[in-house]
From Swiss-Prot:
Organism: Desulforudis audaxviator (strain MP104C)
Binding of anthranilate 1, residues: G80, N111
Gene for this chain: trpD
Presence of keyword Amino-acid biosynthesis: yes
Pathway: Amino-acid biosynthesis; L-tryptophan biosynthesis; L-tryptophan from chorismate: step 2/5
Residues that bind 5-phospho-alpha-D-ribose 1-diphosphate: 80, 83-84, 88, 90-93, 108-116, 120
Reported cofactor(s): Mg(2+)
Catalytic activity: N-(5-phospho-beta-D-ribosyl)anthranilate + diphosphate = 5-phospho-alpha-D-ribose 1-diphosphate + anthranilate
Protein name: Anthranilate phosphoribosyltransferase
EC category: transferase
């Protein structure tokens, strides 16, 4: 199938969803050569990916990911694409604890740094979270603690077949936007930040055809893959089979304007400190950004009727200590997993 796909791309034609799914299946199953994979990725980048192609790729990757069992029917994720280059602190990771503290289970899908100095895995490791869990342990953590970190390399082992070509190409490819769409838990609720507005719209269209109940795809002011305080954010509300574009201005929710630099982070140690400060009650633009992004997840989960109410719930999660407690319990649970043999049992 990949040869046929390359012929279409050379001619400037788009792939149908089923064709994209079949091509990604070949890649993930080790049936495509490095040259073919590199040509496909470069061809897609030159042509520009479509929502149908992205959706097809995501479906194939989901099907081949190691599954994470959970008893929760409604699970949220706050994973974004990264790649905005803004070097902010880990906003969506901090927001995940706020969402979990408000009672919505969170399966945080993530990895080490892509374009920043500190990815979600980096900051969590520095906070004391053990990332070396089996899929069964991840699921048990989600059920017991209400939040779990799903370390992408552990769950998407078939990605090894594309690792070499991606590294050799040295350019952004479709894989850079597939991470948030390939969470093995298949969360029904998502807040998904994207580094580019045009790509965000594509991602929203792709997500509408996957298993989602309600999601918000966002592109923040200052070209962030988060809602920022620098200005209005572009927001795409996603429901099954439909996408509605809109604008979210933090000022309308009572927040003060702040420039992107006020959200700056640094090394894993710096970002871990910032996360702890917020969870322990620090005020200011960083807290506000976390409230905004967590509020969107709570709104998508149906915990509030509007954005203002959702932000209030997020503030309660922080101020009551519930968000901080989720981090403490996550650290304790994953520490216990160090002393259990990796045989898919706890």
């Amino acid at each position: 199938m990949i040869r046929e796909a390359l012929q279409k791309l050379v001619g400037g034609e788009d792939l149908e969803q089923h064709e994209a799914e079949a091509v990604m299946a070949e890649i993930m199953d080790g049936e495509a050569t490095s040259a073919q994979i590199g040509a496909l990725l470069a061809g897609l980048r030159l042509k520009k990916e479509t929502a149908a192609e992205i959706r097809g790729f995501a479906r194939a990757m989901r099907a081949r990911a190691e599954q994470v069992p959970t008893r929760h029917e409604l699970v949220a994720d706050t994973c974004g694409t990264g790649g905005d280059g803004a070097q902010t602190f880990n906003i969506s990771t901090t927001a995940a604890f706020v969402v979990a503290g408000a009672g919505v289970p969170v399966a945080k899908h993530g990895n080490t740094a892509v374009s920043s100095r500190c990815g979600s895995a980096d900051v969590l490791r520095h906070l004391g979270v053990n990332l070396d869990l089996t899929p069964a342990q991840m699921g048990a953590c989600l059920d017991e603690v209400g939040i779990a970190f799903l370390f992408a390399p552990r769950l998407h082992r078939a990605m090894q077949h594309a690792a070499g070509p991606r590294k050799e190409l040295g350019i952004r490819t479709v894989f850079n936007i597939l991470g948030p769409l390939t969470n093995p838990v298949r969360p029904r609720v998502q807040v998904l930040g994207v580094f580019d507005a045009a790509v965000a719209e594509l991602v929203a269209d792709a997500l509408a055809g996957l298993e989602v109940e309600r999601a918000f795809v966002i592109h923040g002011a200052g070209r962030l893959d988060e809602v920022s305080l620098a200005g209005p954010a572009q927001v795409w509300e996603v429901r099954p089979g439909s996408v509605r574009a809109g604008i979210l201005d933090p000022v309308d929710l009572g927040f003060e304007r702040a420039d992107v630099e006020s959200l700056s982070g640094g090394s894993p140690a710096d970002n871990a400190r910032i996360t702890l400060e917020i969870l322990h009650g620090a005020s200011g633009p960083r807290r506000d950004a976390v409230l905004l992004n967590a509020g969107l997840a709570l709104l998508a989960a149906g915990r509030a009727g509007d954005a203002a109410g959702a932000v209030r719930l997020a503030a309660e999660s922080l101020d009551s200590g519930a968000a901080r407690e989720r981090l403490t319990r996550l650290i304790e649970f994953t520490e216990r997993c160090k002393h259990v043999e990796h045989d898919n049992r706890l």
